[in-house]
């Protein structure tokens, strides 16, 4: 219901209320001290009271100042006989006319209920605003004209507006005496009583008639209708006091009172309910690696996996081991002695001979597979310093150097007054994250996580235990003697006999077959090149060899002609899902996407390290003409008189025209941190920012734990080939899991890498001897023989790739104290201090040099796709892709033309050994041969084959341990032992042997069948191949013809003693036996005749062991024993002795870039380099942290008026509102237009003109805002510095003004001298003089500087500011003034009598010159470092004349912290005739 206020007024009023709060809050203290009341015509008014001293004048009290304004009446042309009511100013139409002319009666609202007011007479309140006229009374006599009011200030002339249309007469005004107008404005006219709800509008007024003469007083008329409110008339004489009227209706609620002081804290409330789950926080920094966890409990046994798909057929296995020995056959008939057999087959190969001498160096092998990339090496040593560069061009003058070292500390000053406790500082920058705290207790059981990915295949289970040996069968009855059995296996090695006497050298044996191939020895030294041998004779053609291994695929043939299109084949079955491809490397960055919307500002990061200095930029363009230089030194004045007292302030000049708006004020101090706001709703997802540059490679992560094994899923469809993923980091090795149950046999795997060498297994029990198999076909090449003896140490190999850096070993014992080290490097910069106050902008610097290339930023989010770029150059050939699914069968192609025969392929390198094939089926039994013709009786044979094995003798005594047998085959690896403690890092090992060849590649598709080639020439004989594997047994051949007698075979091994045979015919003398051990010497008996053999005696006791016989021939190689059970893991061995120092290896490859070392000491400054080319524009950086709050902006333009709101409920009564200054309306008027004709009819409400007291309050408010924007340097409205005053009021003269550099409350403003020519702010000293007298009597003859304030009795340090302000006020304000200034200066006048102040004319030097002490305790001298030296503008104290003279000293600096001067130390004092005094000039800041 603010219908009577212009919408522009409302907007301004609302805006200014906010400003008023800021202005008034600080002035509350002043209002309490000085109530700001006003007195006019002897009447006292409170601050912000509004009254009318005359009917046509309205005044407001504005903090002690009375502001009055004339009331201007609108002409009422439609009212012929308008009347001015008593006490009003403006004429109104009589009510009878309005009622008749309007044609409608004015409705009157219901009368309100009388208020419940106690009859207590209070003090007289200030007059309320004009109430509505009472009902028509009898007309009183005209009162005398009141005294003329004081003339008001002249207002500005407004431009004449276009006349508006006449408005209708408004309804009756609001009810009378309420509170002051501010309460009405807040509450609105929402009362139920009175005429506030009259909705009927008056008709237009008639034309105004001539004023008639006053008629005679009529009889009192009847009670008239309530009239419109009249303008204030001239006051009549006061009538007698009428009877007390009935209580009026309650006034409208006033404005809300000011907030009371905060109440005491309430008791702590009960804890609130559990809040909703918060949004996830930002990810924390990676924690420190935790302790190694304890091994987890064994998991429950998993369910049996689904049956695997049927595996492909395995490769053919190796020939099976010979079967067990068959049962003993029935004894055959005794045959006749046969004829001598053919020469026996070649005996088995002897044991491998000792390792031969190293062969000549073979040709260089094919290059090995590339090794895995080594980890980056350690940083290389710093290179030698390069040669001195050429002299560069002369650099520009450098920036001023840093201040020199502090001078010797002065004598301690007297204790200062303790400063007031400072306000608590703003929060510092967030510290870096702390170290991880101690390990917390285990948390509660978390929710079950989602199913993890399928784990990797577990390690193979431990080999099963060997089955128990079956029970021994019963001994069968001895059968009749069978044919001589085959030679038994070599018996267990007997106890080691004593060495026998050396026998005679035997005849040389036949050359043994080549032994198995030994492991390659280490490379021998290269031998001299041998002479070329003669070409051998071509050998005979051998029989046709078996099929060779398939050759390597030949070179591709020429493309054949296109075949006929075949008919499409049926679609093949769905292929298995291929394995996921390895993660590919990151693709190249895509083209830049369109500019995304600006993202939300990020969280403020920790401060980054200081970047390297950038390169100097290009020289800037020529600058504008500089500002006029500093004021020159004054010319020699005459002698300055002593300073006179300050003159009285001159009369205030006329107020000048309003200056242009001043610049924004300096930035205020940061406010105290606000209380945390409520959490905002989560914002919408921001548009992804631009892609950042690729980040640096992160550190290698730890290996993750293997996940639980998932159950087998159903077979998926063939997926499309995935994009190459990024390579994942290796997780740490998981703890060994428990052995799983043996799984079903899987298909054969690829050939694995060789396992670690297992510990020697326990010897297995000796196997039974198998039947002798038939000789197999020639086998494939044998496996490598056992490793040969270690060769001589070869030359040092090339450096291997650097291994990964091992974990740090345990700390060694502390070393002995070393010699004192060189001075350390300069430490890193400390953390940045809290943000200072913003200084004034400096002058533009020269462009800097181009900066170093920055480090790559972290990888940004992928940008939106950019426009299609041009096609790139073809990339390098990518790796072969995974085989795609089998395509549908193509149509039959036409027959191609016969291709050219391909070139003969190169002989392929032999492929790796194939997996052993499965055992072949046993061959069928050969046919029984026909019985041979009975031969003639042969010559007596040699000693018969040994008979069958006799029964076992009694066990012999335990022999000495035999020599170590050859190592058994590697047993299966035992279970993982517990981790030992970490050993000391060993020395680097020797270079390992060449690695095993890689896995076989996939088979190529078979080539087309080539045509038969023509016979080639016979090739030279190839080298002897290694013996092949034993082939399957062939069928027995046909029975051959009896061969001719062969040469006698070699002696067979001595058989075990058989049962005694029946007496045979006398044989030929046997071969001489080996000499037996010498028996005890007996009498030589005669040889008796050979008796007939008696019956078989019982088995005699075992004779004593004979001397060890000569070694028998090498027996056939036994079958491979079964793998022994795995031995337990042995204890860790003792640490070996340190080996000899190895030869130095060749230099390793370059290591990783080391961490940046600490900065070295600054080198000598090099000559400036040439100016580099200007760099490209950098990409937009990421949003910086939120800066400190900027300076307060200018007030915004007045916004458009809003629609009228709903009427609010009546508020509680408020205190009297503040006054308002009417001059605000000067800013509202529009110069081009007159007033809006409908300006008082905004909400279809009738209204009179704008209430005058609103205008008055606005005018007062406008003055206060203007003072904030353009301070006038008074104590009530101080400026920040004199420079601000000069900018706001350039026409003002130099003089004393008030400033408040630290802003805030104005109580601590200080009075200074403002030099309006230069804008300098000069603070007076207090006191400003040291009286002239003899201050010091020297005790010794030595003269030294004596500090006046510190040493001289009665001396004092100089202080500044006036006595009226609180102590330290000037010091606090000067601290801020220094921050706001860039230059400072001060003059000191030294009055002397027989005392040197500056130059000593007698000696011509400055040794006796006075010292000055700056406010930061620095000493300012007459000579020395130019930044700490003062000048003498006038020097009259050069010699002792017996008269008073003076020297004027000036010190100027851009280090504002050095001024003002706080003490002076003369040297040439102490004599009885030596006197001095000082005038301390003001310190001036600019």
Curated annotation (Swiss-Prot):
Q: Which residue stretches belong to region Disordered? A: 100-1241
Positions annotated as pro-peptide in this chain are: 27-183, 1244-1486
Q: Extract the SUPFAM superfamilies matched here.
A: FnI-like domain (SSF57603)
> Fibrillar collagen NC1 domain location, by residue?
1252-1486
Q: Which residues are glycosylated?
A: 1387
- Where composition is biased (Low complexity), the residues are 194-205, 220-231, 318-330, 337-346, 363-373, 393-421, 478-487, 498-517, 708-732, 891-904, 936-955, 1102-1116, 1150-1159
Q: Where is the composition biased (Basic and acidic residues)?
A: 110-121, 138-159, 253-267, 766-777, 1117-1131
Q: Where is this site: Cleavage?
A: 183-184, 1243-1244
Q: Mind listing the GO biological process terms from this record?
A: extracellular matrix organization
Q: Which PANTHER family does its entry note?
A: COLLAGEN ALPHA, COLLAGEN TRIPLE HELIX REPEAT
Self-association state and partner proteins as the record states? Homotrimers of alpha 1(II) chains.
Please identify the protein, giving its name as recorded: Collagen alpha-1(II) chain
Organism listed in the record? Xenopus laevis (African clawed frog)
């Amino acid at each position: 219901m603010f219908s009577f206020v212009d919408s522009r007024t409302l907007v301004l009023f609302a805006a200014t209320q906010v400003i008023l709060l800021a202005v008034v809050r600080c002035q509350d203290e002043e209002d309490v001290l000085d109530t700001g009341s006003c007195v006019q015509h002897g009447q006292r008014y409170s601050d912000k009271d509004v009254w009318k001293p005359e009917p046509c004048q309205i005044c407001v009290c504005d903090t002690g100042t009375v502001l009055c304004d004339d009331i201007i009446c609108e002409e009422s042309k439609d009212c012929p006989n308008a009347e001015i009511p008593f006490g009003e100013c403006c004429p109104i139409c009589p009510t009878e006319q309005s009622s008749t002319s309007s044609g409608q009666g004015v409705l009157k609202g219901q009368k309100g209920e009388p208020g419940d007011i106690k009859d207590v007479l209070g003090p007289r309140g200030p007059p309320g605003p004009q109430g509505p006229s009472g009902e028509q009374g009898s007309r009183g006599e005209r009162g005398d004209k009141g005294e003329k009011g004081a003339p008001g200030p002249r207002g500005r002339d407004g431009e004449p507006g276009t006349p508006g249309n006449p408005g209708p007469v408004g309804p009756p005004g609001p009810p009378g005496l309420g509170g002051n107008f501010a309460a009405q404005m807040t509450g609105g006219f929402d009362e139920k009583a009175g005429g506030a709800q009259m909705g009927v509008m008056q008709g237009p007024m008639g034309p105004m008639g001539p004023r008639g003469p006053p008629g005679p007083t009529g009889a009192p008329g009847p009670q008239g209708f309530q009239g419109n409110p009249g303008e204030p008339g001239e006051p009549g004489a006061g009538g007698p006091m009428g009877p007390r009227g009935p209580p009026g209706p309650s006034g409208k609620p006033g404005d809300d009172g000011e907030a009371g002081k905060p109440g005491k804290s309430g008791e702590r409330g009960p804890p609130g309910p559990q809040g909703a789950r918060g949004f996830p926080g930002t990810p924390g920094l990676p924690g420190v690696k935790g302790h190694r966890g304890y091994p987890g409990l064994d998991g429950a046994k998993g369910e049996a996996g689904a049956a695997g798909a049927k595996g492909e057929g395995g490769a053919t296995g190796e020939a099976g081991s010979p079967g067990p020995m068959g049962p003993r056959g029935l004894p055959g008939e005794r045959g006749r002695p046969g004829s001598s057999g053919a020469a026996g087959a070649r005996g088995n190969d002897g044991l491998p001979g000792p390792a031969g001498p190293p062969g000549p160096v073979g040709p260089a092998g094919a290059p090995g597979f590339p090794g895995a990339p080594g980890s980056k090496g350690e940083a290389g040593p710093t290179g030698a310093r390069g040669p001195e560069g050429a002299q560069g061009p002369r650099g520009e003058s450098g920036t001023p150097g840093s201040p020199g070292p502090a001078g010797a500390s002065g004598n301690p000053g007297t204790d200062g007054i303790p400063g007031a406790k400072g306000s608590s500082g703003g929060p510092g920058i967030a510290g870096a994250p702390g170290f991880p705290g101690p390990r917390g207790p285990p948390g509660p059981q978390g929710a079950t996580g989602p199913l993890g990915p399928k784990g990797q295949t577990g390690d193979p289970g431990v080999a099963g235990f060997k089955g128990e040996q079956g029970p021994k069968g019963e001994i069968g009855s001895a059968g009749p003697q069978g044919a001589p059995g085959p030679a038994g296996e070599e018996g267990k090695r007997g106890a080691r006999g004593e060495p026998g006497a050396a026998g005679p050298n035997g005849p040389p044996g036949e050359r043994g077959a080549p032994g198995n191939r030994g492991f390659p020895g280490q490379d021998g030294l290269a031998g001299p090149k041998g002479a070329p041998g003669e070409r051998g004779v071509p050998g005979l053609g051998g029989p046709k060899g078996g099929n060779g291994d398939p050759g390597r695929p030949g070179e591709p043939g020429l493309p054949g002609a296109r075949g006929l299109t075949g008919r499409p084949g049926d679609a093949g079955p769905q292929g298995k899902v291929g394995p996921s491809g390895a993660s590919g490397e990151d693709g190249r960055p895509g083209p830049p996407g369109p500019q995304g919307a600006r993202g939300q500002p990020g969280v403020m990061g920790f401060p980054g390290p200081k970047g390297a200095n950038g390169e100097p930029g290009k020289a800037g363009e020529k600058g504008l003409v500089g500002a006029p230089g500093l004021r020159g030194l004054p010319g020699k004045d005459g002698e300055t008189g002593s300073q006179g007292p300050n003159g009285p302030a001159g009369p205030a000049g006329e107020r000048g025209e309003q200056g242009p708006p001043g610049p924004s004020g300096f930035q205020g101090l940061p406010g105290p941190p606000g209380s945390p706001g409520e959490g905002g709703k989560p914002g919408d997802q921001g548009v992804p920012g631009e892609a950042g540059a690729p980040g640096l490679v992160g550190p290698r992560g730890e290996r993750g734990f293997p996940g639980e094994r998932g159950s087998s899923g159903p077979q998926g469809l063939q997926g499309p080939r995935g994009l190459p993923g990024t390579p994942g980091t290796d997780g740490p090795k998981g703890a060994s899991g428990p052995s799983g149950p043996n799984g079903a046999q899987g298909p054969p795997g690829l050939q694995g890498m060789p396992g670690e060498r297992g510990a020697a297994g326990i010897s297995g029990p000796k196997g039974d001897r198998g039947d002798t198999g038939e000789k197999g076909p020639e086998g494939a090449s044998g496996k490598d023989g056992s490793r040969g003896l270690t060769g001589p140490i070869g030359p040092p190999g090339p450096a291997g790739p650097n291994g990964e850096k091992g974990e740090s070993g345990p700390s060694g014992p502390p070393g002995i104290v070393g010699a004192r080290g060189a001075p350390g490097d300069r430490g890193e910069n400390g953390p940045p201090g809290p943000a200072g106050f913003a200084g004034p902008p400096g002058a533009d610097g020269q462009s800097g040099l181009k900066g170093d290339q920055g480090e790559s930023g972290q990888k940004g989010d992928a940008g939106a796709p950019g426009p299609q770029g041009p096609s790139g150059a073809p990339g390098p050939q990518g790796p072969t892709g995974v085989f795609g699914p089998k395509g549908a069968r193509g149509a039959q192609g036409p027959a191609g033309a016969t291709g050219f025969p391909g070139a003969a392929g190169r002989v392929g390198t032999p492929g790796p050994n194939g997996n052993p094939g499965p055992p072949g089926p046993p061959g069928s039994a050969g046919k029984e041969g026909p019985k041979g013709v009975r031969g003639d009786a042969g010559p007596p044979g040699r000693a018969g084959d040994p008979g069958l094995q006799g029964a076992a003798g009694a066990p012999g005594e335990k022999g000495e341990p035999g020599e170590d047998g050859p190592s058994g085959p590697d047993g299966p690896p035992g279970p993982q032992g517990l981790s030992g403690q970490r050993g000391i890092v060993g020395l680097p090992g020797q270079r390992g042997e060449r690695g095993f060849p890689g896995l076989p590649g996939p088979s190529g598709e078979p080539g087309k069948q080539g045509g038969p080639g023509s016979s080639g020439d016979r090739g030279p004989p190839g080298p002897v191949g290694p013996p092949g594997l034993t082939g399957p047994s062939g069928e027995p051949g046909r029975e051959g013809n009896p061969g001719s007698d062969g040469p006698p075979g070699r002696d067979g091994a001595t058989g075990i003693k058989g049962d005694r045979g029946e007496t045979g015919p006398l044989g030929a003398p046997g071969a001489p036996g080996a000499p037996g051990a010498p028996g005890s010497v007996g009498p030589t008996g005669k040889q008796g005749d050979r008796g007939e053999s008696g019956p078989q005696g019982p088995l005699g006791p075992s004779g004593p062991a004979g001397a060890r016989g000569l070694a028998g021939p090498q027996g056939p190689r036994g079958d491979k024993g079964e793998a022994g059970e795995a031995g337990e893991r042995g204890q860790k061995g003792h640490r070996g002795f340190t080996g000899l120092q190895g030869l130095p290896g060749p230099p390793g490859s370059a290591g990783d870039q080391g961490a940046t070392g600490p900065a070295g000491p600054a080198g000598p400054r090099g000559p400036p380099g040439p100016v580099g080319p200007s760099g490209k524009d950098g990409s937009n950086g990421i949003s910086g942290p939120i800066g400190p709050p900027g300076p307060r902006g200018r007030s915004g333009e007045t916004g458009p008026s809003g629609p009228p709101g709903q009427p609010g409920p009546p508020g509680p009564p408020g205190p009297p509102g503040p006054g308002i200054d009417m001059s605000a309306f000067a800013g509202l008027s529009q110069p081009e237009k007159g007033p809006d004709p409908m300006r008082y009819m905004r909400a279809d409400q009738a209204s009179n003109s704008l209430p005058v007291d609103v205008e008055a309050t606005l005018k007062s408010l406008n003055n206060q805002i203007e003072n904030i924007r353009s301070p006038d340097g008074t104590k009530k409205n101080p400026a920040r510095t004199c420079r601000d005053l000069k900018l706001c009021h350039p026409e003002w003269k130099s003089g004393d003004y008030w400033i408040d550099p630290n802003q805030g409350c104005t109580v601590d403003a200080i009075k200074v001298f403002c030099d309006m020519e230069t804008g300098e702010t000069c603070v007076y000293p207090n006191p400003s003089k040291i009286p002239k007298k003899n201050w010091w009597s020297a005790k010794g003859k030595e003269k030294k500087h004596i500090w006046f304030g510190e040493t001289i009795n009665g001396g004092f340090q100089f202080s500044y500011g006036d006595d009226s302000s609180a102590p330290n006020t000037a010091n606090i304000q000067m601290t801020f003034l220094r921050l706001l200034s860039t230059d400072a200066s001060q003059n000191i006048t030294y009055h002397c009598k027989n005392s040197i102040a500056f130059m000593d004319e007698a000696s011509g030097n400055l040794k006796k010159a006075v010292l000055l002490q700056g406010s930061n305790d620095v000493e300012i001298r007459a000579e020395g470092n130019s930044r700490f030296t003062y000048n003498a503008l006038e020097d009259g104290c050069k010699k002792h004349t017996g008269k008073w003279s003076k020297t004027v000293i000036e010190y100027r600096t851009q280090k504002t912290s050095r001024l003002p001067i706080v003490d002076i130390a003369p040297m040439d004092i102490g004599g009885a005739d030596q006197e001095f005094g000082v005038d301390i000039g003001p310190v001036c800041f600019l």
